[in-house]
Amino acid sequence: MNLYDRIKPGKRRRGWGGAVFLAAACVVLVICFAPIGWAARSHQRYRRFSTDFAASVESAGKIGAALTRNGETSSLDPDASSRLCRLICAAGAGKVQPSCPQGEPLTVRYHSGAVLDLWEVEIPEETAKNPTGVFVRYTFADGTVYQYDTDQIQMNEVRLALGLH
């Protein structure tokens, strides 16, 4: 008689325990990584906007840009365009919005084909730094639109940067 003859192997249980655990682990992974993917995509879109905007401002320094305000179009000083770019880029990414506000925007048309539209808007969030802010809509030369609002800058700062009083 062998030492191990008295030991009887247990019956193998067939159940859903492993599959349920695997499914729960997959759900947890999706819940954890989906916000990371969303944030990475938002950051990538903002970087594309800021890079293209800076390139448009740089070309405006050589070629020029047009400013439209209250239906009147005038040429935009390269220094003013540069100040506006610094102001908008320093404010950082705002809250992406699906639609534009009503009213006449302050519009800067770059010769690269890009268009920057700015509106003064109310910021309804309680956590907002200021109750009003600026809605930014940037149309790339290929027609793609990136738009957001931010409470980090005010329309009077935009007017000051552009030399409008």
Label every model-predicted segment:
Residues 2-165:
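Function-determining sites in protein domains
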